[in-house]
């Protein structure tokens, strides 16, 4: 029996701000209808929609303020429940809808938006539960109260929406300094505890508890993460124990590594990297769904060394990435990052060709 290939597309806060922010309700709804139709026409089966990008919400929440990606000012009244509308229209079109949450980010370094008392981060601003650094403002992953806050946000979605999945992206550990106080405290109980162990344990707790909440609600709802494609960075920068999640049941239903590399990338050539990820999965409870970098089409890839011009010179990289991934033992589908790169109506000729080449192999 042939397994259905899942075809995911990310709709990020960047698309939401571009297409929906500050528009009239009817315009917003028509735009959402159009986006979902585009996804359906292309053949996407699953949408990963960013519902919380900055300690906020694109839905009616009692915990988080409305998102600046939809309204002019954080906390302004949402014209309607954007998540609810996306779910209804997706289901009407036989597309599954996953709520994508950025668990730790409160602000990016580009954001000048003030944090007011309607944001749960407000009361933690001068504590070690929150850190302001060069990348932005972030919740501390080592803090128990913060973990409870993130989980209560997940529960709120599970309780109020007919969601098909919960998804976390790759922004795990925000910095090298955010949790040092907590670490020193933890070392009093265990002298041998390394900082790396401590950090991996903190994110693992969040992942495990999220999985448990999701499955308690409904075992058919999926939970997965999209860690960075470079495994080393997951252990040394993001502190996320991807090998554990790949080999043991009870953490994730799927891993969606961001394998944002071409075939000639000197550091992480695509095929070798996707095979490496596949080899870590040793339980049939976990599936592999590589995320692919459609946003790189037509661009120079500065860190790819030998593959620097690959995305400029070729127009069928994404299609070939899908074709080479399909035979892998744990493969269940692919994901495209992101909507605007593949479905906007002003694609470059090259992106259009890349898109057509991908579409052609979906008919098979």
Model regions and ranges:
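Active-site-adjacent "subsite" loops/lids of carbohydrate-active enzymes
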Residues: 4-29, 98-99, 104-160, 305-309
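Substrate-binding cleft of secreted/luminal carbohydrate-active enzymes
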Residues: 249-267, 276-364
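Catalytic domains of carbohydrate-active enzymes, especially glycoside hydrolases
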Residues: 30-57, 160-165, 248-254, 325-334
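The substrate-binding groove and active-site-proximal loops of carbohydrate-active enzymes
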Residues: 14-26, 64-80, 133-151, 192-202, ...
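Alpha-helical scaffolding within the catalytic cores
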Residues: 208, 231-244, 267-281, 317-322
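Aromatic-lined substrate-binding rim segments of carbohydrate-active enzymes
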Residues: 35-36, 49-102, 188-217, 269
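Polysaccharide-binding and catalytic clefts of secreted carbohydrate-active enzymes
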Residues: 28, 84, 119-248, 260-261
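Glycine-rich, aromatic-flanked loop segments that form ligand/cofactor-binding clefts
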Residues: 44-52, 79-131, 167-169
